[in-house]
Amino acid sequence: MHEPCGGCGELLDVTNLGPFETAICPICSTETHVKREFGAYRLDQRYAIGGMSVIFVGWDTTLDRKVAIKVLNEEYCNDEIRIQAFENEGRLTAQVSHPNVVKIYALGRAYGRFYLVMELLEGLSFERIMAQRGALPEDEVLDIAIQVAAG
């Protein structure tokens, strides 16, 4: 697979590079980020890193909407057990329809990498809120507990 250099247009071999890895052009030394397209989805920025995957903020080029794209780490892309767990996560979550459960839009594979496309939830995590604010008032904690119990 080849992508053009952002500086001079030279075609760079990016076959073995993962999402957002950098290729350096041998002609002009420009750094080019590669593999931003996963089918109909474009990876725009890293959002979170987990034990088995990286989540990107992306764009659904077909439906013109922001999405979250979870990409299985490259080291697990030949591990059938991890692939199955990743795919099961997507399939099982897609069967749940609840306001407190993220919606799954697609499950796919591109460039040998497995990915899930899901609803992008924006805002602060509970962990971040606690780090910023410390102990929360009882009424807020109860509201959060009710939401957790419902979902």
Model-derived features with residue positions:
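Flexible N-lobe loop architecture of eukaryotic-like protein kinase catalytic domains
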Residues: A48, N88, S97-N100, R113
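Conserved short submotifs of the Hanks-type protein kinase catalytic core
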Residues: Y111-S125, I129
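Protein kinase glycine-rich loop
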Residues: D44-G51, I55
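Non-catalytic scaffold residues of the protein kinase domain
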Residues: M52, H98-V101, F126
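AlphaC helix of the eukaryotic protein kinase fold
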Residues: N73-Q95
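Glycine-rich ATP phosphate-binding loop
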Residues: V57, R65-E74
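Activation segment signature within eukaryotic-like protein kinase domains
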Residues: I144-A145
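Activation-segment/catalytic-loop signature of the eukaryotic protein kinase fold
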Residues: L107
